[in-house]
Amino acid sequence: MAKFLITGGSGFIGTNLINKLLNDNHQVVSIDIKEPKSKEHNTIFRKVNLCNRQELESVILSYDPAYVIHLGARTDLNGKTLEDYDANIGGVKNLLFVLDKLKNLKKVIFASSMYVCQPGYVPKDFNDFMPHTIYGESKVLTEKNIIDWNPKYTWTIVRPTSIWGPYFDEPYNLFFKIVLSGKYFHMGSKACKKTYGYIDNFIYQVESIITSNKDLVDHKVFYLGDYEPYTITSWADEIAGTKNIKIHNIPYSVFVIAAFFGDCLKLVRIKFPMTSFRLKNMTTNNFFDLSEIKKLAPHLPVSRNIGTKQTVDWMVANYSI
């Protein structure tokens, strides 16, 4: 049994990760500014703001974890300035400061984001950044702050790709809802190929980093996700097939008009499932070289087909779809 601290433990990834760690009989403390998604996590939850160093220090030092998995962050794209994403910048600096004081710390995994580069851009190396959102810029600073701090303990940065599964939030839970409601349409040949990742496979990769030798993971950066990219067309058909739904094709021009309409509604703060930003993401190939993490975690435990069925079953149970 090991002692784990999970920041951002009330989020989608954190909730699933904590479930796995508890099932494996590890000791866990979860910190977040939001209440847990699962009532079973209430006893291990500590309400802590990463931007409050004193509060953070009190909880972490009293717990004295051996392993820290840092998932806590602001991840939406609605912020207007870098100050809006201070959890990803000042919060990370606070965490680095506190972790230096731990006596029994063995490894830390820091979660960054694939959005340190815009979709479709292939970086030359892990120091090549090209963010297209303020959120992405904040995650670039997350990585730079960690590297500049250069902690003495074993540390790894991971860049989650498009991770999905039970407890997920927008945009992928919305994608599932639209498909399962029969309101999704293919956009012909415009569909793209992307790296996605089922949550159980992501957790397997994280655990593989934790259990790997120091020389294989220390000061390293890994993209995490499923090893074969998906086409959104085939995945949507797979989701729809769980409910015997037939997806039809409509002209791409209709999506362009819908995106323009969505942009207009966004100006008056009305949500709409399609915007120009989302349409561009849906039609831009975006896949990554996962060969390095595959060396550490060669056999993903869950196929896309099984993950899709498990996720649909979860949505039926929780959203009455």
Language-model regions, residue ranges each:
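Conserved Rossmann-fold NAD(P)-dependent oxidoreductase catalytic core, especially the SDR/UDP-sugar
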Residues: 93-134, 156
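NAD(P)H-binding glycine-rich loop region in Rossmannoid oxidoreductase-like domains
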Residues: 50-88, 101, 119-123
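N-terminal Rossmann NAD(P)H-binding glycine-rich loop of SDR-like oxidoreductase domains
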Residues: 4-24
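Flexible, glycine-rich beta-alpha linker
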Residues: 117-118, 156-174
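Active-site Tyr-X1-5-Lys
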Residues: 130-156
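Mid/C-terminal beta-alpha module of Rossmann-like enzyme folds, strongest
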Residues: 212-274, 303-312, 319-321
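Substrate-positioning beta->alpha
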Residues: 168-174, 188-211, 219-223
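Conserved C-terminal active-site "lid" loop/helix of NAD(P)H-dependent oxidoreductases
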Residues: 199, 237, 258-300
